[in-house]
């Protein structure tokens, strides 16, 4: 990719399919609405004295003719001049400015059902099948033939922006010393042969998947993968595990990459990686009991450098892991696209593989296929020092992660729907109750809400720690003996309503997080100092998401997981099924306040307690209705 080193700030425009409906521009919410919602969101989460100070600062910011209105006008002008007024601000803030290492901290993983590979050929057949599915899906993208997504859940039926899909196989996150760059591959009329990178035994190989404008068959791919597996065993050809460098902090990796780029051999190898469609990581055995928790850990960090942690290249958006022991899934660099896009793509691949696996796959004997190429590296002592440092830091990440994949089996979304409640709102309120049960407080909570109803829309935040949720959790724990079941039920309904209303605001572009971010970044561009509203302790607190949550629903046999976003926080990803709910809960062992196992147990207690409350109240409602019917019948009988 010749322009990788250039400053590429502008996102490449995707050509829209003629069948793809136009979606509107993201609105800029009214200033006063956002300021009032901000105060409402934070009032019960900070000390009273601190809130009084914040309220005064916010009122000053929002005064008629004041600074807030000036910044709002600039944002509204920006909306007219750009496709999406918050896109670049959000991308920088959420991902590209973040200096933390990608494993656990940023890159989510999807774990497939465990495969039963009898031998290495089974592993390679699975990988060949998967690569064939990637080619199939990429062909849909290249021809803009992917069916348009429509919104589900709240306000369902609206068409969604499809641009994120075109970053699945054409993007690359380039490390920078202070800020990363999201690079998009430029399409050309006569494309060169497409290739993927195969990681095997910490070595990297180029596998051409199209030769002479002919797509390789699964048999061809299997043949080539067998060659790679054999090449990777050659001890004499073994090179340092350069993929380890991508597990480091972004600034450290940028420094190491600058050193690598001084040598032409390294430049050529980096260029091949940066232009590839995706990675396929042929992992060795993990050496652990293969339950959901341990399989997820293998995808999140590979078990460290002495297992499969160096058999990766984290800058590439799509890494497909195929482990010798049947641990398979996807590791995703999150900056080009959101979770639902990753899930839709993965679902398509798994369906393709299920259909394709019915055929017996044999190696094709095509002698004219060129052998895959091993990527070569020239490693200076400086790079060797970087590799040693990266390996040590990856081990720290591995040891520090406290993770559990927990299946709640007592009920699922079918029971929740019978309560005439959104499963997502119900689970979010249950998570607030669980957190309060563990820590006796609520904290700023992040739940991602898609804004793909708008052009270039990514996500905004549903702030689930509402005042109504706070009233409910206190009723269930602090005021339990004093309140009747009907009073608790009313507070539960209020919490569900508040969560649902905020969700609707978020998906329609009216939530507060993106708006406040836009105002802050416009102020940064136009003034020497940030306005006090953005340096105030309450604003800083509001952006430390101690509870980071996401619903990733899928009917397929797979699940998603990720790490916490702050040192004293939790990641909580969940997949509601008809009769169970799967939770993936993460925290850090360094933090003595948090425990993933403790939160998982609290989630179970909370879900059972809410179910019992619903059952009691529906039972008493049924009895009350029966009594009313009986009284009506008696009056009727008397008249007769």
From Swiss-Prot:
| One biological process term in Gene Ontology | neuromuscular synaptic transmission
Q: Where does CoA bind?
A: 412-424, 450, 551
- E.C. no: 2.3.1.6
Task: Name the tissues where it is expressed.
Answer: Detected in brain and in embryonic retina.
Bias type Basic and acidic residues, positions: 1-22
Provide the catalytic activity annotation. Answer: choline + acetyl-CoA = acetylcholine + CoA
EC category: transferase
Return the Pfam families for the record.
Carn_acyltransf (PF00755)
* Keyword Acyltransferase (UniProt): yes
Q: Does the keyword Iron apply?
A: no
Function recorded in the entry? Catalyzes the reversible synthesis of acetylcholine (ACh) from acetyl CoA and choline at cholinergic synapses.
Indicate the family of this protein. Answer: Belongs to the carnitine/choline acetyltransferase family.
User: What is the name of this protein?
Assistant: Choline O-acetyltransferase
Q: What is the lineage of its organism?
A: Eukaryota, Metazoa, Chordata, Craniata, Vertebrata
Q: Which gene encodes it?
A: CHAT
